[in-house]
Amino acid sequence: MQWRAFPLHPNTPEAGLLLEELFANQPVDIKKMMAHLGKTSADLGLPFGERKRTYNSRLAQELGLWAESRNAGDAFHMAAFKAYFVDGKNIAKIPVLLDLAASVNLSREEADAVLTGRAFKTAVDADWALSREAGITAVPTFVMNQDKLVGAKPYEALERLVVANGLKKRQAG
């Protein structure tokens, strides 16, 4: 599996937006949506906090690509997801991102230089362009060959995608 950056609400200001602000012009029942996400998370055994805001993930995506170049991509992404979805942290803030980098044993100083110098800006731009070209409009989206699986789906749906694209099912044990 390869992580790709995706422009999810890219115009969100650094301070974030209340979910009511984000969905102000859309027919979204935020309490119902959050209850559904909470139940789905619980059913999957995943922690999920009480989110009230959304934050701009652009810099987190840039740092995530850097973490991947340091063989710490999965650990960084998991730490960022926990910070955002469980702890409600503002992942647009550099101090938060530096803490996340340090939490997965990456150099805080190197991470600061990556963010300050925008060393992975072009790479994130390329991922965003790729998602537009592929017609991806939501996350998560899993793509194999020309097949897509969009949204939070049960494990079995992902398994069907993988098997349909020629990968053999692993045997337990």
Task: Describe the residue ranges of each PLM region.
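C-terminal cap of thioredoxin/glutaredoxin-like
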Residues: 3, 65-173
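Structural alpha/beta surface segment adjacent to cysteine/selenocysteine redox centers
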Residues: 1-87
